[in-house]
């Protein structure tokens, strides 16, 4: 019996010996890597790093995650009920009683909206208003005393300024990406000409749509809207345009865009000679749609528009921007050149609506 016990103990010792040898000592560990000092960066970089991290911490409480359910479509050859379609996006709180900004494409045609706050609370949301032309929407939840993000002045930003893009990419937890303003004049959409996106290299991933683009002062200067397919370029709706549209979305549920009913173009060198112009400046009227505001106001093809209610018109996008944001029914003075002579006509701004293409008077 004693012999058997000694044999078992000897076997256990052989088994445990290599395991004991496999455990590295502190001396062995020290050879595998080098410990970094507590503060290896230059003081200026450490300070900047801390400022960014502190800024991100201040912004996060007003960031929200938006979940949406839409009606699905059943296969044509199948009688089974349609599966609902689900998607996610981001948003941020602009009013402490639960008013949230997001993208129109995030909540468009939603049957059900759920908003999750940074503290984990969940609320059912309802769409207050949206505009697909600019891709902007307002959602409201029944809550009060919420943290908000202030809207800054996007006209004051400069190319090269640092920005943070916040959101819930891929439906995950909050994320923050860092970059710069790459460009200020990126055309917004064909549907809403005259307005510009903010272009940034801060990553805007799927699910970040509707989140804020924030400057180093903690002010929202844009609403993240889309990214290029390769993901290296992102675009945001400027905050000044957001401030222009939010009152209409909140009160009417939609944006009423101004409309003239003209086709326009830039002035080319051949137009300068043909129309007896002093310079290639202004907006050339290529055609006038019959029965539309421009036609009723007396505008004609080959008119060169140079000012609207005193606002200079140097290029087509100037006219598009001014007309789009002028209240419906406003009577405006249009200064123009016709046959080399300066004239002034009055036009009443109409309402833009989706319409079939009308013939244009040449």
Where are these regions (language model features)?
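Bacterial N-terminal signal peptides that target proteins for export
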Residues: 1-9
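Serine-dependent protease modules
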Residues: 22-281, 286-290, 295-297, 316-320, ...
């Amino acid at each position: 019996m004693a012999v058997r016990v000694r044999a078992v103990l000897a076997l256990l010792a052989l088994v445990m010996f290599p395991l004991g040898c496999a455990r590295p000592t502190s001396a062995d560990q020290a050879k595998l890597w080098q410990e970094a000092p507590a503060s290896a960066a230059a003081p200026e970089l450490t300070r900047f790093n801390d400022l960014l991290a502190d800024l991100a911490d201040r912004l996060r409480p007003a960031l929200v995650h938006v979940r949406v359910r839409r009606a699905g479509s059943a296969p044509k050859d199948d009688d089974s009920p349609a599966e609902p379609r689900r998607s996610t996006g981001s948003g941020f709180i602009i009013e402490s009683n639960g008013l949230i900004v997001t993208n129109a494409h995030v909540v468009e045609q939603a049957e059900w909206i759920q908003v999750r706050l940074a503290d984990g609370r969940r609320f059912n949301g309802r769409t207050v208003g949206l505009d697909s032309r600019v891709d902007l929407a307002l959602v409201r939840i029944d809550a009060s005393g919420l943290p908000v993000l202030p809207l800054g002045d996007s006209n004051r930003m400069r190319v090269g300024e640092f920005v943070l893009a916040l959101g819930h990419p891929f439906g995950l937890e909050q994320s923050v990406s860092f970059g710069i303003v790459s460009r200020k004049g990126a055309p917004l959409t064909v549907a809403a000409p005259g307005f510009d996106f903010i272009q940034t290299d801060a990553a805007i991933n799927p699910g970040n749509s509707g989140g804020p683009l924030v400057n180093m002062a903690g002010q929202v200067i844009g609403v993240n809207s889309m990214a290029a397919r390769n993901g290296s370029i992102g675009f945001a709706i400027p905050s000044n345009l957001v401030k222009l549209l939010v009152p209409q979305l909140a009160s009417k549920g939609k944006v009423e865009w101004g409309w003239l009913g003209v086709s326009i173009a830039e002035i080319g060198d051949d137009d300068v000679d043909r129309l007896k112009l002093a310079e290639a400046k202004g907006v050339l009227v290529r055609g006038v749609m019959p029965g539309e505001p421009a036609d009723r106001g007396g505008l004609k093809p080959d008119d060169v528009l140079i000012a609207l209610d005193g606002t200079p018109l140097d290029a087509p996008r100037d006219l598009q921007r001014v007309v789009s944001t002028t209240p419906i029914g406003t009577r405006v003075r249009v200064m123009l050149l016709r046959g080399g002579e300066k004239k002034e006509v009055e036009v009443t701004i109409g309402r833009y609506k989706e319409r079939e293409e009308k013939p244009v008077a040449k």
